[in-house]
Amino acid sequence: MCLENSAVAIPPDTIEISIAHSPDSDDAFMFYGLATNKIRVPGYKFSHTLCDIETLNLRAQNEAFYDVTAISFHAYPYLQENYTLMGCGGSVGEGYGPMIVSSKPLALEDLSRIRIAVPGTMTTAYLALKIFNPELKTETVPFDQIIPAIQAGKFDAGLIIHEGQLTYATSGLKKILDLGVWWRETTGMMLPLGGNAIRRSLGAESHKIISQALRDSIQHALDHREQALDYAMQFARDLDTRLASRFVSMYVNERTLDYGADGRLAIRKLLDLGYERGIIPIAPQVDFVD
């Protein structure tokens, strides 16, 4: 289910920009400035829709559904004809990332003999999992139901994203593999997880203005951390303030303001490797607007 802003009157000569992102504390934190009108842009009005990331991935593939949308990097080649990546607003794991967890100790070689619950086949977590071992058997489960499904014995293991990376141990689960650690050891790079894409048809001027607005919103949240975190707490599933702050720090930081040359290289490396391994059927054409 998606949550949308209540409709408001749009003044004449105002461009309405639809923004969609996930209902996660890190996304809420970075969009705090725009969502609460702390950041305003003359001539532009921003509307916000909150959807789970797999829904956003699929909507952006079917059509240019939103002007700006959060996506998993894995999904980008499928929507690159209509969207380009923004140079800010992304989340990367620098030596950490999605995890395979289980209710019992498992060796890595055991994974090929079981079914693994995954949060969606368009997530970057799934792409990284398949690069790690393309033979693994998976089944899609809503991301917030993966831990309960493991606890109930429906799956021997699951691939967790979002806040589950911090709460799995309190649910009695054991970490089998951190894909962010594996990726760093394998490539020497950070693991790019999600970013924001903007509709190509908006044009260069709007691209520049909207990119700056998002960058200003991120900077505002970083500069007013306590207020932004208070706002984000309403989206922090099962996290207390301490854990929510830790989670936000993991995924909203200087890299969110700008990936940097090495961050952009990591995005290209991830997608190129997915294409070379036959996981992604479309050759990635990665470009950015700033």
Question: Where are these predicted regions, by residue range?
Answer:
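Hydrophobic residues within well-ordered alpha-helices
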Residues: 59-62, 150-151, 210, 274
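Hydrophobic/proline-rich hinge and linker segments of small-molecule sensing/allosteric domains
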Residues: 85-108, 184-201
